[in-house]
Amino acid sequence: MGEIIKLDNICQYNEMVGQETLHPLVSVIDLSKSSRMMKHVRMSYGFYAVFLKEVKCGDLRYGRNYYDYQEGTLVFLAPGQVIGIDDNGEYFQPKGRALLFHPDLIRGTSLGHNMKDYSFFSYEVNEALHLSEQERGVIIDCLNNISEELNRGIDKHSKMLIVSNIELLLNYSIRFYDRQFITRENVNKDILSKVENVVNGYFQTDKPQTIGLPSVRYCADQLHLSANYLGDLIKKETGKSAQEHIQLRLIDIAKEKILGTNKTVSEIAYELGFKYPQHFTRVFKKNVGHTPNEYRGIN
């Protein structure tokens, strides 16, 4: 595994590709006009990045997997994620365009508040967005608008207009992803991630105390699927039943409560939606091999 280069701010990236910094918190770059040849390297950014790949660029390591990015592909990276391939000694001229924006740019804005809604910045949506020619034109228009605003110079309107255009680009990306999910079949992994999000959200409410343990039907309803379809999908992808899959996430949450708090087993059982502590203890031991108290004692 090669070295990972960390770039904490926009200026560092601009310097790396020979781009003038027009704004310390945002940049739009035409990589084909980069004045510097690049080496293959794995990088982690301290800012958000959207890359529009204009030509086939081969396999890139994105998170834990490799993806073959084709022409007209959008790649989204959140701060802290890693992208690139290990250095093979070769230099190349980068192609495509990049939009970079620091979290500080959107802090306190509606976009900053809603960034969690753009799930394609996380591993939850682990496919890049493959654009049609018309969609590519829309994205380029958004990038051009941001670039034009940056070249005007910073004034009191700059932040609002730049952030609005970034938000517009991301909202178009949501629309284009919806189209891709309809036309592409490889969405099962995404649904599994959403099931986990539903379960996580369930335990952040009082539903466990008022309703009880999360059911397969509840998760399916939240994802607008039938319980049978969701059960078949999870069984195909994991080899486990939907109930077993949900229960594994429940056990992870239980472990966090056992090790992260001083609450009694009875209190934790009630918080998780079990009617009886004995039932919780049986389920926990079946999955972990130890009772909750034993697990707390050995950790």
Segments the model singles out, each with a brief description of its role:
Residues 64-78:
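Short acidic-glycine-tyrosine-enriched beta hairpin
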Residues 72, 230, 279-280, 284:
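Short hydrophobic/aromatic patch on the recognition helix
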Residues 88-154:
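A hydrophobic/aromatic-rich effector-binding and dimerization subdomain
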Residues 137-197:
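An amphipathic alpha-helical interaction segment
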Residues 163, 185-225, 244-263:
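A short, Lys/Arg-enriched amphipathic alpha-helix from helix-turn-helix/homeodomain DNA-binding modules
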Residues 236-275, 297-299:
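Terminal helix-turn-helix DNA-binding modules in bacterial transcription factors
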Residues 281-299:
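…primarily DNA-binding HTH/wHTH and HhH modules…
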